[in-house]
Regions:
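N-terminal Rossmann-like FAD-binding beta1-loop-alpha1 element of flavoenzymes
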Residues: 77-104
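A short, basic/flexible loop-to-alpha-helix module at the beginning of a structural domain
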Residues: 55-76
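Dinucleotide-binding Rossmann-like beta1-alpha1 core, especially the glycine-rich loop
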Residues: 126-130, 139-173
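Conserved redox-cofactor binding core of oxidoreductases
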Residues: 161-264, 285-286
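Solvent-exposed, acidic/flexible segments
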Residues: 1, 22-26, 30, 132-136, ...
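Glycine-rich loop(s) and the adjacent beta-strand/alpha-helix scaffold that form part
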Residues: 261-264, 269-323
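Active-site- and interface-proximal helix/loop "cap" or "latch" segments in soluble metabolic
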Residues: 1-50
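Conserved N-terminal glycine-rich FAD pyrophosphate-binding loop of Rossmann-like flavoproteins
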Residues: 108-131
Length: 323
């Protein structure tokens, strides 16, 4: 440690190698060296706030207290979209199409993996194939029953009532130039699980209507990235959520984000709102064990992104959301 400190001070910067003393070093060592150099000069050191991810007794943890001196950038926009996954990319594409002022931040270096299949109710694709309209009240009841009555029916109704319009938006991009992709619709008996697999009597089994573009050359999220870039927007990669900010009345006014490249903090003021599209918490064992114990005790196979650590959920709860 003393030798590293001497090298840092002698070089006058963090551009050193702890072994050879040369000015070439790995990204990981460089990151640590920058912190050491800042400490050696008596500067405030910016440290990551996204870890740890809670513990075995407290999945939520404590909201980070970020020193104002550590916030070295400020961005102003109308809308902040957090997360370049399936929800965030679709929202960003819609915002770009409508010329909205927004910033899209993503903690990783690329858009997240596309979930190719999504459910729709009475979409234009279903209408083209002559599929009868769905009994929406019955579907809402079935989904609520399968969730043990613990779901928020307002969220389910939003999907039931707006998924067709969402599909029209998606298809308007994917099925036109320069992509011209073909939509695949699975519905009716083809989408129904075999009767002998059912544990309880159920008239409806979802997906009722399933849409996908899995045969497309490019994943949907990559297409959306190209689309928003064609409209003059960009994605702020390597920029993760640190915390939500709110005013004295409790209104969310923006976020504090953190660069995953060098750990500096950025205040992003959002005049009209923040959209959290951060994914779930399947990659956070503490949240899984405490919030979904059955998910960890009886599941024998799973598929999830390691990046889904529930940080957006935790940040929302810290800001006052109910879970």
């Amino acid at each position: 440690a003393d030798e590293l400190r001497k090298q840092l001070m002698a070089a006058g910067s963090a551009e050193i190698d702890g072994v050879s003393g040369s000015t070439i070093t790995s990204e990981a060592v460089m990151k640590a060296a920058k912190s050491c150099y800042a400490q050696a000069k008596g500067e405030a050191v910016v440290s990551s706030v996204q870890l740890p991810t809670g513990d075995e007794n407290d999945w939520l943890g404590t909201e980070p207290d970020i020193d104002e001196a550590a916030i070295t950038e400020t961005w102003d926009t109308d809308i902040v979209i957090v997360g370049a996954g399936n929800g965030g990319m679709c929202a960003a594409a819609y915002a770009a199409q409508n010329g909205l002022d927004f910033r899209l931040i993503e903690q990783n270096s690329s858009v997240m993996e596309t979930r190719h299949w999504y459910g729709t109710i009475d979409s234009s694709e279903a209408q083209k194939k002559g599929i009868a309209p769905v009994d929406r009240a019955e579907l809402l009841s079935e989904i609520s029953r399968s969730m043990g009555g613990r779901c928020d029916q307002r969220v389910v109704k939003t999907w039931i009532n707006e998924s067709a319009a969402m599909h029209d938006f998606v298809s308007g991009i994917l099925e036109n130039e320069p992509y011209n992709y073909v939509c695949n619709l699975t519905a009716g008996d083809e989408a129904k699980w075999p009767d002998d697999t059912q544990v309880s009597q159920s008239k409806l089994m979802f997906p009722v209507q399933q849409v996908d573009y899995s045969s497309a050359e490019k994943p949907r999220n990559v297409v959306f990235q190209e689309y928003i870039e064609s409209k003059g927007y960009s994605i702020d990669f390597n920029t993760g959520l640190a915390k939500l900010e709110k005013d004295a009345d409790g209104r969310i006014t923006g976020v504090i984000a953190q660069s995953t490249a060098d750990d500096h903090f950025i205040r992003i003021n959002a005049a009209k709102g923040v959209l959290l599209a951060c994914g779930g918490y399947a990659g956070n064992p503490y949240m899984m064990e405490q919030l979904d114990p059955l998910g960890t005790s009886v599941t024998t196979a799973c598929s999830y992104s390691p990046a889904t650590k529930g940080y957006g959920i935790r940040a929302a709860v810290w800001a006052g959301a109910n879970l």
